From Swiss-Prot:
Homodimer. GO terms for molecular function: D-tyrosyl-tRNA(Tyr) deacylase activity; Gly-tRNA(Ala) deacylase activity; Ser(Gly)-tRNA(Ala) hydrolase activity; tRNA binding. A motif (Gly-cisPro motif, important for rejection of L-amino acids) lies at residues 133-134. InterPro entries: Daa-tRNA_deacyls_DTD (IPR003732), DTD-like_sf (IPR023509). This is D-aminoacyl-tRNA deacylase. HAMAP family: Deacylase_Dtd. It is found in: Cytoplasm. A Gly-cisPro motif from one monomer fits into the active site of the other monomer to allow specific chiral rejection of L-amino acids. Its EC number is 3.1.1.96. Gene3D superfamilies: D-tyrosyl-tRNA(Tyr) deacylase (3.50.80.10). Keywords: Cytoplasm, Hydrolase, RNA-binding, tRNA-binding. NCBIfam families: D-aminoacyl-tRNA deacylase.
Length: 145
């Protein structure tokens, strides 16, 4: 799995003109991508890492501050630009594989005590945020091996 975490003072996800998820207080926007080798265990470990990552004010974590998270699925995190000018998405897991893992990631965050807002899987989403810092972190679970 890959996540891009952005510290934000506010954020929202809009689908078909309707806000479906938002941060109204400072927190984290988490873009999540899934590949074919990811498992429920991967999702749980990544959720724990994100929840405990000390990147908020005064080197505190979202867990320390009970800061909200806005989780948005994003298969494009697995884009390959190795050949030509058109990205390939072949490393991204297909929807029937990735949607349950993104859901498991969100469910595990909630079980840890996180307030989690989400986008809508597979929808055309408009994501807006005010990046605080800016602070943007990339985590790829393949780097853990």
């Amino acid at each position: 799995m890959r996540v891009v975490i952005q510290r934000a003072t506010s954020a929202e996800v809009v689908v078909e003109g309707r806000t479906v998820g938002s941060l109204t207080t400072p927190g984290l926007v988490v873009l999540v991508g899934v590949t074919g080798t990811d498992t429920a265990t991967t999702a749980e470990k990544l959720a724990e890492k994100v929840w405990g990552l000390r990147i908020l004010s005064e080197e505190k974590s979202a867990s320390d501050l009970n800061a909200p998270l806005l989780v948005v699925s994003q298969f494009t995190l697995y884009a390959s630009t190795r050949k030509g000018r058109r990205p390939s998405w072949s490393a991204a897991a297909p929807g029937p594989v990735s949607e349950p893992l993104v859901d498991h990631f969100v469910t595990h965050l909630r079980s840890l005590g996180a307030h989690v807002e989400t986008g809508i899987f597979g929808a055309d989403m408009k994501v807006g945020l005010v990046n605080d810092g800016p602070m943007t972190i990339l985590i790829d679970t393949d780097d853990w091996h």
